[in-house]
Regions:
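Thiamine diphosphate
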Residues: 1-182
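Single conserved hydrophobic/aromatic residue that forms the stacking wall/gate
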Residues: 181-190
Length: 190
């Protein structure tokens, strides 16, 4: 007998999903997978983690960062911050209970540990959702979410109010990259 849990998330926004990358099924089940590779190893870089409808904002921000600021990024689709947290807790537990063995790495560390740049995670939920994985990364970690109450006439204005739109993601990304002491090319201000 296998315990299986199915959940379905519904949103009130219709949009086309990007094509599923090759060999990402395991990552989907574990909580995240890379949807966009970085294009250069020489430019300043950031890891963008997006979930739900905000993933599209992350993809758009990634394009702006590259075209206007020469900041490269890798974009990760987070299917479950909860699964990433559960895995992190289990790996942490195993490492603490077996100090004489080689430490294992959480799935989030396996994905992001060798990647360059800070991490920026954004979600349509409260920041605490993305913050669940903060302690399982060794990199600078920043999160964006929809904390508080927002009253806006359009979805675009609401995302801007909560600072989870592509413009705010770009601004936060540039600051996060500068805080990690990576050299940014000289460009116009945000």
């Amino acid at each position: 007998h296998e315990n299986i849990f199915y959940y379905i998330t519904t949103m009130n926004e219709n949009y086309s999903h990007p094509e599923m990358p090759k060999d990402c099924e395991d990552g989907i089940l574990k909580g995240m997978y890379k949807i966009k590779e970085s294009s250069s190893s020489k430019e300043a870089k950031i890891q963008l983690l997006g979930s739900g409808t905000i993933l599209r904002e992350m993809m758009a921000a990634s394009d702006i960062l590259k075209k206007e600021y020469q900041v490269d990024s890798e974009v990760w689709s987070v299917t479950s911050f909860n699964e990433l947290r559960k895995n992190g807790i289990e790996v942490e537990r195993q490492n603490l209970l077996n100090p004489s063995e080689t430490n294992k790495k959480s799935y989030i560390e396996e994905c992001l540990g060798k990647q360059q740049g800070p991490i920026l995670a954004a979600t349509d939920y409260m920041r605490i959702n993305a913050d669940q994985i903060r302690s399982f990364t060794k990199k600078s970690f920043y999160s964006l979410g929809t904390d508080g109450y927002g009253r806006s006439d359009t979805r675009k204005n609401l995302r801007s109010f909560f600072e989870v739109d592509k413009e705010h993601i770009v601004a936060y990304s540039l600051s996060a990259v500068s805080y990690t002491h990576l050299t940014l090319p000289t460009t116009s201000a945000v």
